[in-house]
Amino acid sequence: MKFKKKFYFIVASYFRFFANFAFRRWHPRVIAITGSVGKTTMLNLVECTLGDKAHYSHDANSAYGIAFDMVNLRGVTGSKLRWFYLFLAVPIKSLFYKHKEEFYVVEIDGERPHEAEFLASWLRPEVTLWVSLGLSHACQFEQQVKDGLFSSLDKAITHEFAMLPQYTQKLVIIDGEVDLMNRALDSIKQKNLTKATVIKCSKDAVKTYKVEPNHTSFILQGTADGVSHEYEFNRPMSKDIAIQLTMLETLVNYLEVMPRYDFSNLKLAPGRNSYFDGKNGLKIIDSSYNAHLISVKSILEMYKAMHVPHKWLIIGDIVDQGSIEGQEHAKLADEIIKVKPEQVILIGRRTKKYTAPILKEAGLNIYTTLDPREALKFLEQNLTGQETLLFKGSQYLEWLIEKLLKNPEEAKYLPRREKAAIKRRQKRGLN
């Protein structure tokens, strides 16, 4: 396993070496976005605001993906033979390719130890937006805790993300309501590890929040002028997005660009609170992409705030949790209970083992299965068309949604449409 991790960075260093020629030729103002969840949504908000002034690292947030993006190449999503092409194409394109935009808005993942530092020490962003902190990809950091490098998973993951602020040149924007984030930045400043200004945002700016299956509005008090502004979205958005809107306003003030408040045409990546009309009048909210407790909790709080009858939850397992999967799925049950849903469908061995018993004890109507096909059968037999369905988690929920769409052609807007994902579903008999 250790060799595999070292090999990952050896190969990543090869691609970074060549991609750096294109990066230095371009010399953009780098705006880095990091965090456990919410990075892509933050990137989309920035994109709506800056438009064609920036290049955006869509579908690229790893050491490999960002190197490929630097020379306008896509990573490996299909045949493994593409690796041979990339080993040749990256050096060649690095000799002449150059992005032309003023800004590079780049999403940086902290999925594995040392990756954030690997990217931060290369890109050295002008601005970093650290949007969230939680136990996503916890299994990747367990060895560091076992080796005594950190006393807990929380501290190991915090340390990883904190590498970006250390290498940031001008401005670091964080969620000031997250204690571990605050402590990390206070420590970095006390040790003079960064000269960047640190601005801590909070949800205190929220004056009103209204959410429906296909619409959300916020009224936020401006951080700079104190004037209240209304933000509009044509999809359901969690209240936690207020932190990102406040961060966006802070960024806009720093860059001295025009702010934006109407996000009705905001295009989010698939599986991030997409609204669909379902068969026979069903309302479908697809939030199936991310499956970590921090994101599940946020979406369930949104669902609780939504004034609709007949709330049904379809929940898949939380993945990549390693030894803490039991406690995370027990916490998941507590969050589900707060929503008071009419019906809960749990899919996966983890939700069946850890979540279902707590929900049963609380008196909720639940249906558990390991097979998405059985879940579909239950839905088709029991839905009346008056329900609002929220999908969150793993276990091929995108396949379930596809079968319930009023307009089958809208399946192209669901997550995991790449060939490899389609093949995985087919192997499970999900055609």
Residue ranges and their predicted role:
Residues 1-11, 15, 26, 51-52, ...:
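ATP-dependent carboxylate-amine ligase
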Residues 21-25, 51-159:
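ATP-dependent carboxylate-amine ligase catalytic core
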Residues 26-28, 100-101, 120-284, 308-309, ...:
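Acidic, Mg2+-coordinating active-site environments of NTP-dependent enzymes
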Residues 32-34, 107, 130-132, 175, ...:
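Short beta-strand segments
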Residues 33, 41-57:
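A conserved segment at the C-terminal end of the G1
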Residues 55-56, 103-107, 172-174, 284-286, ...:
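Short catalytic-loop micro-motif centered on adjacent basic/acidic residues
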Residues 59-62, 132-135, 203-206, 368-375, ...:
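Short, acidic/turn-prone active-site loops that include or flank metal/cofactor-
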Residues 109-113, 178-179, 290-291, 372-373:
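Short beta->alpha connector loops
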